[in-house]
Amino acid sequence: MKRVGYIYEKIWNIENCKAAILDAAKGKKRRRNVKRVLEKIDDYAEELSAMLRDHTYRPSPYTVRWINDGIKQKRRRLAKPRFWPDQCVHHALDRVMAPIMLKGLYYYSTGSVKGRGEARSKKGIERFLRKHPEQSKYVFKMDIHHYYDSIPHKELKEALERKIKDPEVLWLYGEIIDSYPRLAVDPESGPADPERGIPIGIDPSRWLCNFLLQRLDHEIKHFLGKKSFLTRYVDDIVATGPNKRKLHKVHGLVEKHLGKMALTIKKNWQVFKLSSRPIDFLGFKFYKDKTTIRKTILKRLKRKIRKVSKMCRISLRNATGLLSQLGYVKRSDSQYFREKYIKNVISKKRLRKVVSNERKIQREAERNMA
């Protein structure tokens, strides 16, 4: 792996800092604390540049909250950084480092990265199952236990050192990585391990969580060869192959690799025959010839459709959330559900109009501020 250097100056460059502030402000320009920064953006860009150049940046405490995430409603602990200076620093770092971190990432390593969402994993699985039925007789499925909260700082920093030779960039990553257990205090979770964990919900984390498993992705794919398929969505891994013996060896390979970082596989890992049951992954159920949605998700979606359809005024949050969930149905073989519970019940046109009107209001507010 060729190490990358001489990049820190690009991060604290005034123009990059100014663009980072604007990136961080997207979707929240009407907030008072954001308005204050945008009204004097040139001054704040200079201040941001100076604190990065002079190494005076110190992360602020996070706001910790729990959410039910995505269509699967998985309970997650989010650590939200302050807009100023933390989110602006994160964007300044990511604007320069994103293309560098993207290099070497396995093609079907998806999740948390723009352009590499669940759709890429879904299409990859469907394509392989349909085109290569003989090579997809068996399936290996697993995920990592509490991945984000268990990421070891020492191994993550060592991996970054193998990728980056600029000591100042490594310093900034170190500040962000070390800040999480110290500043994301949550009474519900208890004291955090000071040597482990990165926060869900901040921009650098989405790259770091994928970057740490980059070697594992290539190691598995090399072991499986061309006659198998592999995809990883953040910490969930699915692999297919013509025989289960080799997939059991993949489990051993993954366990050994993760064990070096004191990470563990969840106990519900499995190797099974595709003809006996579908692949339950990303909220979908993948069969050899079709893709459906998990029943629990359809039940929640049914309730949501009924609730929103009865509203006199639909909020932006409800409109965007429901449009996203309806997209799941569109991307699956769920014709019966569409006909019975969506068609003539909820208007996508109405939902899109809510989103469009809100965006017009936001653009008008931005023009007035300018």
Question: PLM features: residue spans?
Answer:
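Short Gly/Ser/Thr- and Asp/Glu-enriched loop/turn motifs at secondary-structure junctions
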Residues: 60-62, 231-235, 268
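Right-hand nucleic-acid polymerase module
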Residues: 87, 91, 186-195, 248-255, ...
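Active-site-proximal segment of RNA-dependent polymerases
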Residues: 3-8, 94-152
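Amphipathic alpha-helical blocks
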Residues: 37-61
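Conserved pre-motif C helix in the palm subdomain of viral-like polymerases
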Residues: 74-106, 194-222
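Conserved polymerase palm-domain catalytic core
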Residues: 51, 128-234, 238-255, 273
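Non-catalytic, polymerase-adjacent accessory regions of viral genome-replication enzymes
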Residues: 1-46, 362, 366-370
